[in-house]
């Protein structure tokens, strides 16, 4: 049977890809930084490079540690990447070319884009775009600030929060009341973080039968949309079939369908029970506006980097795997963040949605902006990391 390898998949899949053309490493420090951070954890660039140079044999041996007899999928990915990184470093010292793709990704891209979009210092600092002199761990900081039991719990909060989930959802994760959930997130990220729920709520309110696709333009002029729909609605298809006595047959399909409401504002399909067949269907997906604007901002930054590098690399969301171009990637990503600060993507998207709207829409919410300046981004160095 065929086995597919997904270039946008797990770590072990992306680690199998390499540059089609060999290249000579010119800035070895980028590779040494990655090696030291992978083995010892986050640290400043200069410290990582000094540590590697002081004990090269140790780091090379650690990168090439044998795989266990029963590795997990995660361990397999780490082993593949680490051994290939060691081979690339060795190629440099031997004066040889390499095909290796060096990888760095955003340190919580969702928090970066929300923070910059709302000029929120409280959000930007833990996302490593607020001018901190060292690389920070946004999950660990949230754990400490809210007194959570584990870093994984902080991840469980960040995921729904940064995708526009309601305070009801966050309250269930935090096991508290809705009001307490609101207090918790504002304690962590200031009042601007409440813009997320406002935008998501507005996206639900403006999604109607005549406006199932909310349309806007990205900073670089591409079209973007957020679609309100119902997942896996059952559809019975009837067709002529002379092979049976009835003369017809039928087939049950499940299909995503655009959001559709009755004159009473009730869903025509989706969210019902088996006793109400008109409403039988899957999950209603109409709360995606905030997340989709964020994804469009992600994609804009990615296009900036692809243009700057001539398309050389493997592109996985906000994870960049490139052949000897990481310094250029970092510089370009910072320029994208600075442009994003000026553009105010979330507000701009809502303005565009209103201009494309069919009918009269609810007024867009007034967003709360913080006092962060562009200097915070200019003075940041760890927005991408191994």
Pin down the residues of each PLM region.
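C-terminal, non-catalytic extensions of nucleic-acid polymerases
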Residues: 254-269, 277, 303, 330-386
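Amphipathic alpha-helical/coiled-coil segments positioned at domain termini
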Residues: 314-324
């Amino acid at each position: 049977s065929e086995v597919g390898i997904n270039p946008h998949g797990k770590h072990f899949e992306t680690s199998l890809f390499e540059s089609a053309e060999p290249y000579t490493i010119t800035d070895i420090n980028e590779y040494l930084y990655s090696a030291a951070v992978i083995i010892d954890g986050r640290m400043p660039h200069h410290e990582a490079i000094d540590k590697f140079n002081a004990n090269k044999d140790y780091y090379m041996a650690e990168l090439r540690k044998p795989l266990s007899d029963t590795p997990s999928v995660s361990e397999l990915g780490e082993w593949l990447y680490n051994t290939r990184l060691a081979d690339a470093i060795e190629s440099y010292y031997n004066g040889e070319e390499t095909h290796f793709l060096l990888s760095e990704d955003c340190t919580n891209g969702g928090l970066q884009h929300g923070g910059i979009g709302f000029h929120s210092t409280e959000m930007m600092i833990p996302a490593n775009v607020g001018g901190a002199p060292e690389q920070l761990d946004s999950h660990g900081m949230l754990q400490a600030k809210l007194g959570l039991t584990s870093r994984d719990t902080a991840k469980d909060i960040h995921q729904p929060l940064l995708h526009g989930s309601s305070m009801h959802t966050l309250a269930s994760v935090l096991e508290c009341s809705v009001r307490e959930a609101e207090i918790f997130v504002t304690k962590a990220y200031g009042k601007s973080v409440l813009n997320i729920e406002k935008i998501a709520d507005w996206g639900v309110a403006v999604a109607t039968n005549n406006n199932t696709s909310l349309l806007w333009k990205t900073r670089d002029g591409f079209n973007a949309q957020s679609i309100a729909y119902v997942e896996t609605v059952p559809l019975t298809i009837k067709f002529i079939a002379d092979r049976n006595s009835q003369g017809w047959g039928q087939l049950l399909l499940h299909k995503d369908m655009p959001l559709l409401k009755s004159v009473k504002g009730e869903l025509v399909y989706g969210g019902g029970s088996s006793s109400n067949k008109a409403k039988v269907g899957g999950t209603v997906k109409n709360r995606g506006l905030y997340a989709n604007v964020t994804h469009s901002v992600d994609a804009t930054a990615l296009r900036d980097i692809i243009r700057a590098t001539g398309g050389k690399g493997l592109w996985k969301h906000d994870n960049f795997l490139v052949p000897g171009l990481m310094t250029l990637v970092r510089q370009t990503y910072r320029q994208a963040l600075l442009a994003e600060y000026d553009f105010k993507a979330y507000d701009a998207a809502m303005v565009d949605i209103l201009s494309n709207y069919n009918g009269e829409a609810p007024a867009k919410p007034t967003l709360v902006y913080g006092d962060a300046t562009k200097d915070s981004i200019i003075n940041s160095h760890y927005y991408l990391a191994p």
